[in-house]
Amino acid sequence: MQATEANFDGLVGPTHNYAGLSFGNVASQNNEKSIANPKAAARQGLRKMKQLADLGFHQGVLPPQERPSMRLLRELGFSGDDATVIARVAKDAPELLAAASSASAMWTANAATVSPSADTHDGRVHFTPANLCSKLHRAIEHESTRRTLRAIFNDADRFVVHEALPGTPALGDEGAANHTRFCADYAARGVEFFVYGRSEYRRGPEPKRFPARQTFEASRAVAHRHGLAEAATVYAQQNPDVIDAGVFHNDVIAVGNRNTLFCHQLAFVEQNAVYDELRSKLTELKADFNVIEVPDAQVSVADAVTSYLFNSQLLTRPDGKQVLVVPQECRENPRVAAYLDGLTSHAGPIDDVLVFDLRESMKNGGGPACLRLRVVLDDAERAAVTQGVWINDTLFGRLDTWIEKHYRDRLAPADLTDPQLLAESRTALDELTQILGLGSLYDFQR
């Protein structure tokens, strides 16, 4: 049966703001306390989804999570009605209100790790929501993520949505941002590639400036849970020096698709050995392996971090050629722009580059790859997905109108104290679940 890759992008939520919550994420820290535009952010992401759908890619949407998270604030000891809780947190612990209000669930590359049915022990698609335990504002996401995934992938004969791994530093899991899959064809068995920043129990190099968020132990646990064959699984350590330079996830320094890996020269520890293991295991599956390694002399790690060259989507078009989806910051960096011009002028796996304005997300450290969760589906599996989440002309129009109706065009950190923002968000999300056909997804609907 034929299979293709679908991308499920996160729809930016109404509380999108710049609180600078993510230590190790250079853009997040640099833009702390800036004025955000949630309406523009949501529309920028939606336009990317629509353009890719128009090009023939299977494109779905994942809804925002409810924010601010009143559950978190009440669990932390604040009581009273919603307005009273928000006022008390704003006065006593504004950093907790910022964490509870973050729209970071829009970066669905961190939502889960996904293994397609061709790779798993039981022939079903497996999802493990990421515990994201390194950051408070993200550690509160996984329960809602699991609920959302189960609403969309609700056929138990075809899909398994697990619980997140235990939320301990030893099992720190950041999802698909540290995972990719290589194969000759999407329907064929592939090699799954897990990248970690440190190991809890093994000796090895670690970053000194910024934390490594993904552990080897978490990656191995996900592979075991999904029933992946050891002969078709590769683990690699991310270069700790690039983590210290702001590469907080592997998808800021590398991206893969089918049999192609596009990465920076300094992406991994023992990089050539990583290539050799991937090539060897793919050869066993009768698949070729292509590496496009970007020299540090042409594009530095600093350029990669500011432009998000590697936080791109590498997609296979219906005609079999590959296209690289990059943020407009890549065209604004002269060295990165020159590299991309050369990349497509030579005969190689990547035939074209598409450029998108994702400025609102980029200012928080999220490019095209951050905004999407990849799910390989065969024809029957795709038909089993809740159909209301697929982007088409009708859904695009309804979502665009919904954004115009419900989203603010200006949100400063001080605005998070406004209890009306919670009311506005709940009204918007209640309508959204009806648009997408997802039922009572949120706590306030139950």
From Swiss-Prot:
GO annotation terms (biological process): arginine catabolic process to glutamate; arginine catabolic process to succinate
Catalytic machinery residues: 174, 249, 370
Domain of life: Bacteria
Gene3D superfamilies named in the record: Succinylarginine dihydrolase
GO molecular function: N-succinylarginine dihydrolase activity
Catalytic activity, EC: 3.5.3.23
Keyword set includes Hydrolase: yes
Hydrolase among keywords: yes
Keyword annotations from UniProtKB, A to Z: Arginine metabolism, Hydrolase
Pathway noted in the entry: Amino-acid degradation; L-arginine degradation via AST pathway; L-glutamate and succinate from L-arginine: step 2/5
Catalysed transformations (reactions): N(2)-succinyl-L-arginine + 2 H2O + 2 H(+) = N(2)-succinyl-L-ornithine + 2 NH4(+) + CO2
InterPro entries: AstB_sf (IPR037031), SuccinylArg_d-Hdrlase_AstB (IPR007079)
Pfam families, per the entry: AstB
Binding site for substrate: 19-28, 110, 137-138, 213, 251, 364
Function: Catalyzes the hydrolysis of N(2)-succinylarginine into N(2)-succinylornithine, ammonia and CO(2).
Family recorded in the similarity comment: Belongs to the succinylarginine dihydrolase family.
Self-association and partners: Homodimer.
Protein name per Swiss-Prot or TrEMBL: N-succinylarginine dihydrolase
Organism of this sequence: Paraburkholderia phytofirmans (strain DSM 17436 / LMG 22146 / PsJN) (Burkholderia phytofirmans)
